[in-house]
A protein has these predicted regions:
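Actinobacteria-biased recognition of intrinsically disordered, low-complexity terminal regions
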Residues: 1-15, 352-354
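Short, well-ordered beta-strand elements
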Residues: 44-46, 307, 315-334
Length: 354
């Protein structure tokens, strides 16, 4: 195990945070691991893992976020709404394929339904699995392109009336991405860069693999490497790659860290505020709360907002405590498994750090 921690030595609390992260890292077994914390703009980064460090420091590698890409999609939608370019209640089919005949339930699906997993759509299209299963551990998404995602949506038969039940859906968020691209006449990757990445200064965040040796390499549970993820037509749901330092920048914008510069564009400030606001309760006695794009839990130190993600060989966790200046980003390069401790460890850092 190799460890590095970085934080200004003169800042009160920094050594304590470094010790907390070093202790937490012992619970995670992965070739590469990064645990990063921002406290009121002061960053502490712990790197480690069972593999030998490469020529690029672990905290400067871009990691696959998987489903932790969805907060980026949510912020993009919120900003487009703030700009008046779309509305949450716009019907997706009307924007994506005006006049195309669809099932009445599909006609009722709005942009809000797609983002909040209340569209009634399944997690993935039914015809996704036959082409994915033969290559489930290597490239399940690459053979299912954008036009196929759109066609699957237009011919869908939702399981439930839109807006009545919560069911996590990569399919739905992917459709949201294609719908926003159609509504604005701008490819998703360009739209995300213009509206989210560039304004927040996320220069090391992208949706495609970067130059050689700049991306982290994922691993199966047995330690063998896996190829970089190709998300096919599911880009909006899981294609973002970012360095842990960029992840902290993204989270610091959400947490409202006092020393961070206020967004120059009021629509960005409005979007950041909107995605922090609880909008949905579900489950037994409405115990589970969600914002537009974040899971929302209570903690001893106030509410926490978070999202985790996993790909074929990597994992990521993003979380923050609004109004407290605390943000946590974590990445690991081993495929998730039943006894995996990565998410629980990162969640513990977020919820138990004083």
């Amino acid at each position: 195990m190799t460890d590095t921690t970085t934080a200004p030595a003169t800042v009160p609390g920094a050594p304590t945070t470094a010790r907390l992260l070093a202790e937490a890292a012992r619970a995670v077994d992965a070739p590469d691991l990064v645990l990063a914390v921002s406290r009121n703009g002061v960053r502490t980064v712990h790197t480690g893992g069972s593999a030998e460090p490469g020529p690029v420091p672990r905290e400067q590698l871009a990691y696959e976020l998987g489903s932790a890409s969805k907060p980026y999609a949510g912020l993009l939608l919120a900003r487009l709404v703030a700009q008046g370019r779309v509305r949450y209640e716009d019907r997706a089919a009307d924007l994506l394929a005006p006049g195309f005949p669809v099932h009445p339930a599909v006609r009722r699906i709005t942009l809000r339904h797609l983002l909040t997993h209340t569209s009634g759509l399944p997690g993935l299209p039914a015809d996704f699995y036959p082409q994915a299963v033969p290559r489930w551990s290597t490239d399940p998404y690459g053979g299912y392109p954008a036009d196929r995602v759109v066609r699957a949506f237009l011919r869908a038969r939702p399981r439930h009336r839109p807006g009545t039940r919560w069911h996590y859906s990569n399919f739905a968020v992917s459709v949201l991405g294609h719908t926003l691209a159609a509504a604005t006449g701008t490819p998703w990757e360009v739209l995300l860069h213009q509206q989210v990445l560039a304004p927040l200064g996320l220069d090391e965040t992208r949706v495609r693999p970067g130059p050689e040796s700049t991306d982290a390499v994922g691993h199966r549970r047995d330690g063998t490497p896996v190829p970089a993820l190709d998300t096919g037509g599911f880009t909006a749901a899981g294609a973002v790659r970012a360095t842990p330092l960029d992840l902290l920048t993204f989270l610091e914008a959400h947490v409202g860290e006092p020393s961070a510069p206020a967004p120059r564009d009021p629509t960005l400030a409005a979007a950041l505020a909107e995605v922090r606001r609880p909008v949905l309760r579900r489950g037994w006695r409405h115990a589970h709360t969600h914002t537009l794009t974040w899971f929302h839990h209570p903690s001893p130190y106030g509410p926490v907002l978070f999202h985790a993600g996993a790909t074929l060989g990597q994992q990521a966790f993003l979380g923050f405590r609004p109004g407290t200046g605390l943000a946590v980003a974590a990445t690991a390069t081993r495929r998730v498994h039943r006894a995996d401790t990565f998410v629980a460890t990162a969640y513990g850092v977020l919820t138990e750090t004083p």
